[in-house]
Amino acid sequence: MTESDDASRETPASRGGEASSNQDLSKPESNHVSLDLKLNDTFNDDTKSTKCEANPRVFSCNYCRRKFYSSQALGGHQNAHKRERTMAKRAMHMGRMFGHHHRPYTYTSSSLGMQAHSGLLHHTLSQPQPLVSRFHHQGYFGNTVPLFFDYDDGGSDFFWPGSFRQVVEEAEAPVVVVASTESGLDLNSVAANGGVDNNSSKPDLTLRL
């Protein structure tokens, strides 16, 4: 046999080996491509989840259209609106019962019968105070209240604090008028016949009611 025949016989075998080696090399490449596809699919899932988280659900208030991101916050906000409206309705109802037509939660000094401090001071200074105090403003022994003390127990005239009647007594019956002032007490002895005798050695200093 010649060398050309041996070369022709070995050529198909060698070709078959080369083809098998090429197939073995192509297998890892196909596996690598499949792995890349799986990674791409997971990446797409992550992007979808992030998009859903970026756009959360929004709840809007029925009264003021304010937006909230949780139903609990929206419920508390709307409950506050309901309480506010209930209080406003109650105030309006009370105003109608008492005849006031003012807005709720708005009170003025004129509606409550109040007067400023300066106005009260001006009103007090503009009116002169009487010399004799009145019973419904001051007590019995207030400022400038005349008190009459009679020495005669059997006198017919009865004097009460604040009386303006003239003192009419019998002869030689002294009357002491005591007027309380801011500085103290003023004592004035008055006698029916010319006053009290200052030259007497033993004056009568006893007071009788």
UniProtKB/Swiss-Prot annotation:
Coiled coil: none annotated. GO terms for biological process: abscisic acid-activated signaling pathway; glucosinolate metabolic process; negative regulation of abscisic acid-activated signaling pathway; regulation of DNA-templated transcription. SUPFAM superfamilies: beta-beta-alpha zinc fingers. Keywords: Abscisic acid signaling pathway, Metal-binding, Nucleus, Zinc, Zinc-finger. InterPro entries: Zinc_finger_protein_7, Znf_C2H2_sf, Znf_C2H2_type. GO terms for cellular component: nucleus. It comes from the Eukaryota. PROSITE patterns: ZINC_FINGER_C2H2_1, ZINC_FINGER_C2H2_2. It is found in: Nucleus. Residues 1-32 are annotated as: Disordered. One of its GO terms (molecular function) is zinc ion binding. Disulfide bonds: none annotated. Its main location: nucleus. A zinc finger (C2H2-type) spans 59-81. The keyword Metal-binding applies. Seeds over-expressing ZFP7 are insensitive to inhibition of germination by abscisic acid (ABA). Acts as a negative regulator of abscisic acid (ABA) signaling during germination and early seedling development. This is Zinc finger protein 7.
